[in-house]
């Protein structure tokens, strides 16, 4: 264990002990957890869509007709849960989040230093990430988030009847961000599954906007990988030099997926103010879910998501002081034959390059749960192994046990690059 990790663990443990015995570093909010169910079944309730066109930003909610969805009990998606805790901003309003991120950008707050009264510790229920059925169910939700609405393609166990919030016949093919909302019978548990990247048949319907957001979040500098490429922003300054200030401004623009994901979260929170929310998603959807999870201290399970730590830092997401990475509520499931998950889908010979994607980020927040399919199955590095259906059928379902989850210390993104601030 590195000295830095040891110090972070010690500091967090010290803060936690002090919180119990005297005034404390974190304010604690303990919700009643005596009757936490061991398992719940969830079904689709809503689909949220934020259209992010160049000239306008539109938002629609589609409500699923209850009589038509999951009529058979075996079609419900089971989730096993257990008790846990979350450390997050006490005030989770949009204004408070914006204020924290602004002060972090200005150097007033940092991962190691922010006022103790900003934070609270809350007892919650979290997914049992050692339960294969639970992970498979979350994977199914992530897979379903790709499907076009109304019925199309391989949507799993979905009925034909829909109630559509105006306008009627909304075009789901336009650029934007989608979140599919699942709930249990009493709406105490809500899962938001975010749609992933539409690339090479992996997903449908939003590929152009996905490419821009992928390249902003997961490339070192606006997808500046060759003189022949059209970059997605103008932050490049010189050879292996990129403006940090410019990058941070770009990822926080209202037309970007992170901003739209906040709209989805607050909309769901308004509908279900007392519910426990979890997040999931595949690829870009998984990374977007992880960024939301970090913003609010929400349990998040992703599948084959590209490294999200670089994006989290550029967005200046809330980081409780002293909280070790492995204590955050983000788990990234993936395997070692997926170049996107590993941050190796780069270079002129890669399909990412051919599609205009620069997937260069390597480091994940939280914990990585890695299947060794290279050793166990003889797979080779290929983007074809990135598809969610492949992950469901040939990895999660095929393995008897789930992989162990752990944080990868000393990970470095974009080690050749320098990122000066504009005023430095």
Curated annotation (Swiss-Prot):
In which broad location class does this protein mainly occur, judging by the first location in its UniProt entry?
Answer: membrane
Q: Which of this chain's residues carry glycans?
A: 187
Cite the InterPro entries for this sequence.
AB_hydrolase_fold (IPR029058), ATG15_Lipase (IPR050805), Fungal_lipase-type (IPR002921)
Keyword Cell inner membrane on entry: no
Q: What is its EC number?
A: 3.1.1.3
Regions that span the bilayer: 10-30
KO phenotype (gene knockout): Impairs atg8-processing.
Where found, per UniProt? Endosome, Multivesicular body membrane; Prevacuolar compartment membrane
* Alphabetic keyword roster: Autophagy, Endosome, Glycoprotein, Hydrolase, Lipid degradation, Lipid metabolism, Membrane, Signal-anchor, Transmembrane, Transmembrane helix
Role: Lipase which is essential for lysis of subvacuolar cytoplasm to vacuole targeted bodies and intravacuolar autophagic bodies. Involved in the lysis of intravacuolar multivesicular body (MVB) vesicles. The intravacuolar membrane disintegration by atg15 is critical to life span extension.
- Family label: Belongs to the AB hydrolase superfamily. Lipase family.
Q: What is the protein name given in its UniProt record?
A: Putative lipase atg15
Q: Say which species the protein is native to.
A: Schizosaccharomyces pombe (strain 972 / ATCC 24843) (Fission yeast)
Organism classification, top ranks? Eukaryota, Fungi, Dikarya, Ascomycota, Taphrinomycotina
Q: What gene is it encoded by?
A: atg15
């Amino acid at each position: 264990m590195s000295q830095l990790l040891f110090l972070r663990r010690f500091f967090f443990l010290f803060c936690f002990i002090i919180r119990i015995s005297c005034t404390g570093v974190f304010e604690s909010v303990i919700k009643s957890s005596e009757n936490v169910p061991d398992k719940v079944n969830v079904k689709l309730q809503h689909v949220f869509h934020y259209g992010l066109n160049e000239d306008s930003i539109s938002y629609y909610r589609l409500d699923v007709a209850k009589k038509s969805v999951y009529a058979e009990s075996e079609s419900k998606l089971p989730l096993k849960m257990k008790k846990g805790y979350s450390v997050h901003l006490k005030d989770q309003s949009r204004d408070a989040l914006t204020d924290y991120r602004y002060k972090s950008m200005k150097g007033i707050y940092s991962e190691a230093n922010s006022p103790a009264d900003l934070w609270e510790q809350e007892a919650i229920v979290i997914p049992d990430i050692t339960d294969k059925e639970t992970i498979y169910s979350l994977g199914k939700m992530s897979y379903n988030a790709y499907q076009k609405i109304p019925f199309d393609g391989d949507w799993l166990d979905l009925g034909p009847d829909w109630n559509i919030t105006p306008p009627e016949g909304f075009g789901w093919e336009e650029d934007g961000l989608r979140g599919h909302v699942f709930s249990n019978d009493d709406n105490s548990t809500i899962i938001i599954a975010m749609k992933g990247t539409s690339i090479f048949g992996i997903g449908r319907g939003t590929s152009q906007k996905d490419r821009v957001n992928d390249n902003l979040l997961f490339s070192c500098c606006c997808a500046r990988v060759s003189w022949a490429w059209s970059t997605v922003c103008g932050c490049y300054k010189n050879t292996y030099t990129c403006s940090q200030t410019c990058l941070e401004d770009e990822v926080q623009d209202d037309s970007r997926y992170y901003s739209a994901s906040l709209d989805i979260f607050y909309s769901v929170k308004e509908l279900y103010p007392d519910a426990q929310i979890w997040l999931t998603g595949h690829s870009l959807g998984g990374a977007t879910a992880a960024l939301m999870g970090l913003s609010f201290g929400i349990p998040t399970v992703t599948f084959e998501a590209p490294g999200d730590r670089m994006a989290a830092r550029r967005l200046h997401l809330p980081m409780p002081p002293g909280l070790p990475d492995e204590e955050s509520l983000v788990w990234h499931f993936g395997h070692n034959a997926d170049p996107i998950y590993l941050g190796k889908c780069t270079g002129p010979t890669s399909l990412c390059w051919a599609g205009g994607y620069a997937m260069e980020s390597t480091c994940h927040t939280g914990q990585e749960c890695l299947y060794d399919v290279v050793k166990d199955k003889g797979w080779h590095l290929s983007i074809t192994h990135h598809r969610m259906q492949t992950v469901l059928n040939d990895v999660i379902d095929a393995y008897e046990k789930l992989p162990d989850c752990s944080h990868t210390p000393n990970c470095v993104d974009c080690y050749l690059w320098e990122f000066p601030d504009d005023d430095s």
